[in-house]
Amino acid sequence: MRRGVRRIVPLTLGWADLPLDVSIFGAPPDARLREPVPGVLLLCDGGWLLLDTGYNTALITDPVLRRRYHGDPLVQPLLPGPGEPLPDALAGAGIGLDDVHAVAVSHLHYDHAGGLKHFAGRVPVHVQRRELAYGMSGGPEPERNGIFQVDYDDPRITWRQADGDAEIAAGVTAVLTAGHTPGHQSFVVDVDHSAGGGGFVFACDAADLTENIDGELAVGGFVDVPPEETVVQIRKLKCLAAERGYRLIPGHDPVAWPALTSDLATRWPPAA
């Protein structure tokens, strides 16, 4: 019998205060919301797999770096406390950095790839080949689109590059959902029968909000494609979830993410 994931631990690694039209194309420009910045821990054969890594704290806490990288007053990152969000969140779940055996990033935006510094020289990092190529292409365009080379241009990182859909661990499949960025990937997670079965589809930034999914509304951020292409990816994920009977999780929803966190804490209570 095919093995699956035995436990899922959602992490909240910060928040972003931003205009709604960052997440929904064509939303009223004066509408705003505070979105969570998630990470997901998956207990797989061999150890924990981490999906996404949150912010690079130094780019927020250092005043000079903050002006350099987060100077837009309309889009502001928020940290959960004075420490390092990722190690602190892992510790809160009773997990150390050394317990993480692999990392996968949905894409290289600063709120997803900023914590890769914790894993350089330690574990493999899964990414789509076209995403990494775009991020390493040089020139000003990637940074204008929220991809900061300082987060991931480290020769110590061991990349595992995929060309399209790929199984990255038993029960975890990366699904290419390009549009938001050139190599964005979402994740289909199959839960092992011993842990209750079923599963989830984590859209990541292919669909920020429940409104993107239910209304098939284009996301507000996209690179080198028309906004309608992001709706194609939303429909693809909806079909995948429906075929499997899985719950489709939006990437930054301020209601859906806390609800999932609560639901999974009930299903898999934290260790005492």
Predicted segments, located by residue:
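Conserved beta-strand hairpin/beta-sheet module of binuclear metal-dependent hydrolase folds
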Residues: 15-88, 186-205
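Active-site gating loops and adjacent loop-to-helix segments of metal-dependent hydrolytic enzymes
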Residues: 61-80, 209-223, 265-272
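Active-site metal-binding loops of divalent metal-dependent hydrolases
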Residues: 53-56, 108, 130-131, 180-181, ...
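Short Gly/Pro-enriched turn/cap motifs at secondary-structure boundaries
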Residues: 29-33, 175-180
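Metallo-beta-lactamase
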Residues: 78-111, 118, 124, 128-176, 182-261, ...
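Short, electropositive alpha-helical surface patch
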Residues: 105-107, 184, 257-272
